[in-house]
Curated annotation (Swiss-Prot):
Mn(2+) binds at residues 337, 361, 528. Converts the aldose L-fucose into the corresponding ketose L-fuculose. The active site is at 337 (proton acceptor), 361 (proton acceptor). GO terms for biological process: D-arabinose catabolic process; L-fucose catabolic process. It comes from the Bacteria. InterPro entries: Fuc/Ara_isomerase_C (IPR004216), Fuc_iso_dom3_sf (IPR038393), Fuc_isomerase_C (IPR015888), Fucose_iso_dom1_sf (IPR038391), Fucose_iso_N1 (IPR012888), Fucose_isomerase (IPR005763), Fucose_isomerase_dom2_sf (IPR038392), Fucose_isomerase_N/cen_sf (IPR009015). It catalyses: L-fucose = L-fuculose. Homohexamer. It comes from Citrobacter koseri (strain ATCC BAA-895 / CDC 4225-83 / SGSC4696). Pathway: Carbohydrate degradation; L-fucose degradation; L-lactaldehyde and glycerone phosphate from L-fucose: step 1/3. It is an enzyme of class 5 (isomerase). It is found in: Cytoplasm. This is L-fucose isomerase. The keyword Metal-binding applies.
Amino acid sequence: MKKISLPKIGIRPVIDGRRMGVRESLEEQTMNMAKATAALITEKLRHACGAQIECVIADTCIAGMAESAACEEKFSSQNVGVTITVTPCWCYGSETIDMDPMRPKAIWGFNGTERPGAVYLAAALAAHSQKGIPAFSIYGHDVQDADDTSIPADVEEKLLRFARAGLAVASMKGKSYLSVGGVSMGIAGSIVDHNFFESWLGMKVQAVDMTELRRRIDQKIYDEAELEMALAWADKNFRYGEDQNAQQYKRNEEQSRAVLKESLLMAMCIRDMMQGNNKLAEKGLVEESLGYNAIAAGFQGQRHWTDQYPNGDTAEALLNSSFDWNGVREPFVVATENDSLNGVAMLLGHQLTGTAQVFADVRTYWSPEAVERVTGQPLTGLAEHGIIHLINSGSAALDGSCKQRDSEGKPTMKPHWEISQQEADACLAATEWCPAIHEYFRGGGYSSRFLTEGGVPFTMTRVNIIKGLGPVLQIAEGWSVELPKEMHDQLDARTNSTWPTTWFAPRLTGKGPFTDVYSVMANWGANHGVLTIGHVGADFITLAAMLRIPVCMHNVDDAKIYRPSAWAAHGMDIEGQDYRACQNYGPLYKR
């Protein structure tokens, strides 16, 4: 399939239009601000797919309606999905602003004394507020000289945070969520809400019955040569763990091989359904070759599939990872049990960071007292106040083992363009593939089993839908924790030792839902959550504001919270502001 062009960032240099000396004296400085902004973004950021970001600068500085319209015409023809307006001087507020109501927009007003860039910033933001088109304000903390072309650190932070979030918004627009199956075991997140996807994310929902997956497997609607490559890769890289099934449920070698083959086929077919595959067109299967333009997907599995066929654990784990038999590549976003709301949290995290996401059950809160009672050992270090056991049946991205390394040699999860083949191999080597427990999965399957290395910063998120309110976002920054082996083995065995585990310690604030670890668990809005690498809660907050999704729980420092300027007019408490502003403006794509 032909790739749909990626959204670009438009840079709008605006200027005082008075000729005979004023405009002429500002042209170079204004255009240099635009060029510096574009250079910063292209150097520091990439699309989630790894492609370089393109910035489009207006052909001329913008002084009024005519040049603003010319700029808009250029942007419309080049798929600009985000705009940043820059100026070092006074300009004519409402005459020069970006009026597209669905495009994220920011204004950087240069903090200098020679010309009043701050005055234009304030005037333009007032126009945005009055017209109901929110914009983000960027204004440096310290005064700069007029000939200073550097971008201060605080301005850079806001430019990049805005650009990351804005591109996420633009990248999701027009894509689809592929719902394979329906509601899994009554899980509310798998009651896929079309209005949420359409109104808040600008996406469609493609609903496909699981029989379509069955048809593709049975009728060989896949690349048969790729299947052989996938099987050979699995034979080389898969380490098999203990089969904990009773003797009557253990499978022989031939049966196990059939389960592995079908598990790999599920991964291939779900991928093809998401993004298409030209190899199918070569087989005369043109319709199937197109895919569904899906940027995220979910697979129901339980129980209508898994009571008879291999579960989705292997397929989901491999798709969500940054590598497979084709080498290192962009991870997909595939939600276990078709939990579309957790899938959206995964999608947001992937778009912001370019990394794989760890889907998990928020399974158990272990208090220090309970751990010591069960193991005879105290929790220490990051775990001293208690831990949350994040574990599911084996569909978490294998990157979650954290066998990749950052520039300082510390364990991490990296965007795929930074991952070496050796790091991918290390993640595979850290993973065991355990036969699925028959009582859970009568059709068999393999669950990935790994343990996340400790001391790694993570952000846990979840989207929930509240009747009468709409979607809300939860955020909990914290760290993975490494427990003594004997302690881990004892605690892990009490749940299911054939599944992947992350021991998570949220950062506590002593207030509200972050009073203690128990409160974090008690306030979590659903049975699932997502781990995104790094302390990136501030990026999630900015993105949520763009989409008009209020944040109902977070432990991000107030100084890092960055929302549109109009939020400040919705009260003095910043979280109440968020709720009132999101309600006032409504969903980004409201109809």
